[in-house]
Amino acid sequence: MKIFATIIIFLAGIYGSLSAQTLHGTVVTSDGEAVRLANVAILNPTDSTYIAGTITHDNGTFSIAADSKNLIKVWCTGFMPYLGKVANANMRIVLSPDTIMLGEVEVKAAKPLSRIEGDAIVTNIRGTILQNIGTAKDVLGYLPGIISVQGGIEVLGKGAPTFYINGRKMRSYTELDMLKSNKIKKVELVTNPGARYDSSVNAVIRISADRDPGEGFAIDNTARLGYRDFVYGGDDLSLNYRTGKLDVFSNLKYGYNKSKGHSTNVQNSWLQSSYRQEIGLESEGKSQIYDAQLGADYTISNTSSTGVYYKLTCQPSDKNNVYTGNIYIDNILNESSLIDQGSNTHLTSHTVDGYYTAIFGKWTFDAAFDLLWKYSDDDILSNELINNTDKLRLNTESNVDSRMFAAEAHASHPWLKGNFSFGAEYIDSRRNDDFFNPEHLLNDNQLVLDERNAGIYAQTAQRLGKVTLQLGLRYEHIESRYHEFGKFIPEQSKTYNKVLPSVTLVLPIGKNMLQLSYSRKYKRPLYSQLSSSIYYVNRYLYQSGNPLLKSEYSHNISANYRFGQFMIMANYGLTDDKIISEISQYGDNSNITLLRKENSTHDLHELQAFVTYMPQFGNYFSVLTAGIMAQFYKIDYCGNIRNMNNPIGMVQWKNIVALPRNLKLEASLTWRTCGEAENIDMGHTWSINAGITKVFNRHWQAKISVNDIFNTARKSYNTIYSDYRDIYLEKYVNTRGVECSVRYMFNTTKSKYKGKGAGNNEKPRL
């Protein structure tokens, strides 16, 4: 706590030295959206020579010494520059976009404009061909540095990002489906997040969307129906009622999915004898999701608001697996088996989120809290027949009960030629993990993991001539306490104290922009990865956590360069104690393989480089991304060192054609070569998708899409190497499907809810 006190005193000293400013102002767009990191210059009225300058901070405000006779010039990429006289009172400066809009007529041929701005790659969506493409998820797949992967979104070379919508942390991917593209103003991609974000965050996507209050009742409903082996579908319903300063909102979602597949698993072990296990799997399962959210937002004044919401999510699922297995010892058949396994899983979560945001003079302040309760139970029943004679019946039950409280607060203030911000975050979480096996073939377990996480940060962004420099420092203190059957286990309990710096530099090169950044990160294991419970996958494969896992640490250097219609992105990372999948023998039984996580004994070096080309020809818009992901890594395998250095190539080509009668045609190609990632050798894959969208009027929209037209992505295969074993997995799942969606809108605007949430990176760990 002495470090906390020292930093707080340091921050107070800085702000005690802030001098008063003569001119205060706010820079906004024509939609009222704050313009961050806009250039502000005070000019001599006689010859327009430069006198002083600064940049706006996150809420668009600025302060600068100026005389009433001076001129003020404000400009930012993507907007028309502003030039006028200095006002004596607070100034409100409105920047007009350089995309031409004629009344209610959409400029459908306008190209999304991507630019480097501060710590982010910013892409305007409003007024472009992407405006009516569908949902936020559809939009993101067309942006530089972002790809669509199996229904999710990833940042190239960074994995799954953390999402913010109007400053509020996104809780699940369903929110991307519920946010429609015509509500999005711009998207910001941060490829190397600074001190403001949790140290485990590798990339951030910030989405700015409409939040005009409007009046009265509004409805936005999208129904989906598709076929992929089986019929699947769902419905998303958003309701709003707005009156005066009050906004009451509700979101309801239902989804149903059913799927099947088969796979082949070959396990090789080289011990005193050579073991080979060949396992076939036929699986079929169904899942549902029920999601309900109710909340309210109240605008206290033009500069402050508060809100709260409650969310309930239920996800039941059932699955049936049939395994056929053969075990060979020194190439002689030793055992055959047939396993019929059924599983039933229920997951329920309750979330309460609240926020408060305000501007006091030159200060911007926001605070948030989160309460999360999460329950899951997983029951598995296996009936096994060994060598056509021996029968075995096995039941397992796993119950996980998690809860979390989190709170955070942030403040920012103009300082020198930029701004200064600082904040604090506190998280208190607990996970109870109980595992039972009535037949006592596996050990029962009762685990409790308590964790306290406190963090503070300070960050400043300054304009140094034409260069923007952002410096940040974050300190985190974490205490983790591990209990098994009510007994405290000190060797599995950990305490961390970490100081994590970050630097971002943005500078022009001619008419182009270059962004360079460095950050130090660390990633804690998931709670499930720290569990010592043994989970029964099948007769030959068990899975468990590892309570001795350490956090992994990494150094990241990123470079982004934009010129013309091209965006070049590169990243280098060095990771210590990388958490990887390891396979080993379970106890004294060489027929059973245990899969769990371990810290690698070798450092992992990773290099990624991508080029995105975004041309437009009339009503045709295309995004072509090509790149390579390479690693320099080695593992211990069969008593030798195996190099895992084969790079992976990737190409994604997305196309949109705007047709007459409000039609849009889409087509995309995704291709990935074989290569190696960590200790896994991955196979190649490719697919082609297509779709057509029709807007009937301002209330109705329909879309038909076909995923993986040639069903080429149905096969996936990879090999895991570890110690004296390897596992080859070949999986077939039908990825070809057709889907139709219909959307109805009435008096729709985005909810005004501005909460960011707290403990956002602790939730997925639970």
Go through each PLM region and give its residues.
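Face-selective signature of the C-terminal outer-membrane beta-barrel domain
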Residues: 291-317, 339-484, 508, 512-513, ...
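Short, acidic, small-residue-rich periplasmic hinge/interaction motif at the N-terminus
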Residues: 41-43, 75-79, 90-129, 149-150, ...
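Outer-membrane beta-barrel signature, preferentially recognizing the C-terminal barrel domain
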Residues: 448-451, 491-494, 522-576, 595-607, ...
